Amino acid sequence: MKVLWAALLVTFLAGCQAAADAPIKVEQPVEPETEPELRPQTEWQSGQPWELALGRFWDYLRWVQTLSEQVQEELLSPQVTQELTTLMDETMKELKAYKSELEEQLSPVAEETRARLSKELQAAQARLGADMEDVRSRLVQYRSEVQAMLGQSTEELRARLASHLRKLRKRLLRDADDLQKRLAVYQAGAREGAERGVSAIRERLGPLVEQGRVRAATVGSLASQPLQERAQALGERLRARMEEMGSRTRDRLDEVKEQVAEVRAKLEEQAQQISLQAEAFQARLKSWFEPLVEDMQRQWAGLVEKVQAAVGASTAPVPSDNH
């Protein structure tokens, strides 16, 4: 299918667009005869993306219009309508993008003119979209009718479809012509608006250019002064700046020294306070535990004396009973 599209696109770009179909023989599907030229496609084809997309849709419609055996087989499946839907969406997308681009160029044009042109272009765009949708609907209807008449003769349906497609192709050609003309008007308006915008910019830039000339003349007069005088003035300014910075640096160093001395004094004072608090706490602990230690020593001494007395009593000699 892609190879066939490429061949049809080459024919499309060469300007070999035909508008009328040759009659189809009802005995059996055959390749159509060469169609007479209705209008050379190059008259409205300018290479815009939307026109190229419309050309692909056009060539695909020509291929469908042949009603060859391959077309007959694919018309019974949704592939053809899906391809047409894709080509329709692509065409309308490119057309909307081109329209948006022209609308940006129309910004300097009067609002009333821009609204009128946009309304006319939208109407032509809607007609083209409706006719493309009509083509797709006809093919869907044909597929449904053929499927309903399986096993019966479909020659009348094919002849009727061929007639409808010829009419739709003529309508599409008229829509494309109308759309191309309105886009040309749209583009002319955009070009005129752009020229007005350039004139307005030139008027605004005039004073700025004059100011630039005055400034350049001032710079030129300064450049004519002796180089030694300018260097001396620059040296004086640098010297004054360095002296000012040195004075500020010395003042800042003095402030830092004073702050460091204050911090050192505070740290020494806090260290002394901590030392005194530690000595007081040590004395307090000593006063707490000394009575307890003395009491424990007394109790221990008494316990030792009692043990010694008990041991001495148990070792004393027992008197004998010999008389």
Curated annotation (Swiss-Prot):
The modification Phosphoserine is found at residue 153. The keyword Transport applies. Glycans are attached at residue 218. Pfam families: Apolipoprotein (PF01442). Residues 1-18 form the signal peptide. Residues 284-296 are annotated as: Specificity for association with VLDL. Homotetramer. May interact with ABCA1; functionally associated with ABCA1 in the biogenesis of HDLs. May interact with APP/A4 amyloid-beta peptide; the interaction is extremely stable in vitro but its physiological significance is unclear. May interact with MAPT. May interact with MAP2. In the cerebrospinal fluid, interacts with secreted SORL1. Interacts with PMEL; this allows the loading of PMEL luminal fragment on ILVs to induce fibril nucleation. This is Apolipoprotein E. The gene is APOE.
